[in-house]
């Protein structure tokens, strides 16, 4: 049976055929680079950053320890938390698999953990606070050692999301992905502000006869890492395939109840027609690639929303594969489509991505036990350009602006990303003719699928509505694909 977990002990896989993404391909004019910043980790499985102003990263190790890294002091020798006495590591895929600091970690010090329980191998969600470990929710998982899932993360709604695999073996022997009476093969949504947990009243299966109300999304095989885009609250999910396709799914914040298809489908292909429900609506993946041809197990990543590379990489979702360690870049387009490309290679055996409090990306790798910081470099030729920013109207606390970008060079621009910074706390609320994102004061406008090319001497125009306070100073400095415009 094909190894299906991202954390299995493997030597580096043999060279594979050239990457041919099954999703829409596009050039990103972008290369990923990494810098090793720490070593000595023991099979790291997850990365999370507390929102406490400390600049720290928490890193889970499979055996049950949570380590602390700081960019100034490095990797601390003593663990922050050690729950190894509670954690089963039998089988390659069991262990401490997920960590999530409370959104109020600075005041409550609560750290949420997902692991396999040593007494019976049940997948377990627990809270560690004040030195006490409290179990919140478990799901029986003793029959097979693989497909535990384990990712946990808080959404922008303040609720905790937990991904659980289908129960293991191969072919979904319990038909868990398509059943609503089990937590296997699902992503859950929980309110953990209660003593243990409560079910949010707006969960999609609340009140559905026979359904577990904790469920938020169904049809998953082994979700090995999901993450939220802080810009819009959407959820990116990487689901490890059976033997044909690895997939990445992208759900809007309002798509609770989505069925991602397993085990009726594997990626976009029918896996077992007898498990396809009549009248069911399955959500297609936004990216797939061939298992055993281009890799072995997808490793889900994160969307870049940092400031250091905002002008060239804002909105890019970065993922990889355990065996072949490519850097897959995927971007959501304004029209609902997605573009993808391979933009380099990452360190061998990547197991998890995470971001620091500033949105900068890190990754860990399995047996090498290293922490790496990710950076981006533009490969696009520096454009000659001018920008005209026009304030068309303003009222009370709002305004309407238009931006005209002109290519003053002698070569065409074949994909553009224009960046600027607001000085007075302005916020973009709605835009058109460009994909506009904002992180703090930094704004990035990227081309739509139909206006990516700007010929020499040509212009492209986009506009937006925004909110403001008393002052509304127009920006004067713009960068196009990393180069300054006049």
Q: What is each residue range found by the language model?
A:
Residues 40-55, 88-108, 143-160, 215-232, ...:
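Beta-rich, blade/repeat-based domains predominating
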Residues 351-379:
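Blade-level signature of beta-propeller repeat domains, shared across WD40, Kelch, NHL, RCC1
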Residues 26-42, 282-292:
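A short helix->beta-strand "capping" segment at the edge of beta-propeller domains
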Residues 52, 60-63, 94-96, 104, ...:
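Beta-propeller domain segments
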